[in-house]
Curated annotation (Swiss-Prot):
GO molecular function, one term: GTP binding
Protein name: Urease accessory protein UreG
Entry keywords, A to Z: Chaperone, Cytoplasm, GTP-binding, Nickel insertion, Nucleotide-binding
Subcellular location: Cytoplasm
Cited function: Facilitates the functional incorporation of the urease nickel metallocenter. This process requires GTP hydrolysis, probably effectuated by UreG.
GO biological process, one term: urea catabolic process
Family as reported in the entry's similarity comment: Belongs to the SIMIBI class G3E GTPase family. UreG subfamily.
UniProt-listed NCBIfam families: ureG
Subunit architecture: Homodimer. UreD, UreF and UreG form a complex that acts as a GTP-hydrolysis-dependent molecular chaperone, activating the urease apoprotein by helping to assemble the nickel containing metallocenter of UreC. The UreE protein probably delivers the nickel.
Amino acid sequence: MDPVIIGVGGPVGAGKTQLVERLTRAMSHEISMAAITNDIYTIEDAKILARTSVLPEERIIGLETGGCPHTAIREDTSMNEAAIEQLKKRFPDLQVIFVESGGDNLSATFSPELVDFSIYVIDVAQGEKIPRKAGQGMIKSDLFVINKTDLAPHVGADLGVMEEDSRVFRKDKPFAFTNLKTDEGLERVQEWIRTDVLMLDLA
């Protein structure tokens, strides 16, 4: 059975790499996982993941995409597709592969031919009005994550406003608030992977 591919997108610094790191740390004992990171000119995110994650280095592939970061996850996904095939051959038991995009704008989305599900991450420090902008990445993602909730009092962001706006534009689609420094809210993301993605509750 092929692994489920989960795209993780969002602006630079929102916490994409940290989310993948925390999820793999929390769930690697129950789910076989691997990760692919996309950077424009470096493989820095892959190095960070290899250094901080519980995943062995051979389960992490870093790609230098060059140019616009969204191209490698939408218009020309061949590099990511090749990396996915490489990981599948290395680890036939894989259940989940994360594909982290390079930091991009609010309109970036994953090609449905590349990923099965997508997570879009923003951080509170970008301002409470960000969800109201309703970028395509936030609207179309299967899970929307608002990270760095601990910064709300320092930047004058009202989490209640962000929640209300998220409910309006997400409608019935799920979203979660997280503080990945302390793992606050991470269980909500884990539960989404277990039930909505892998449907383990039906197994």
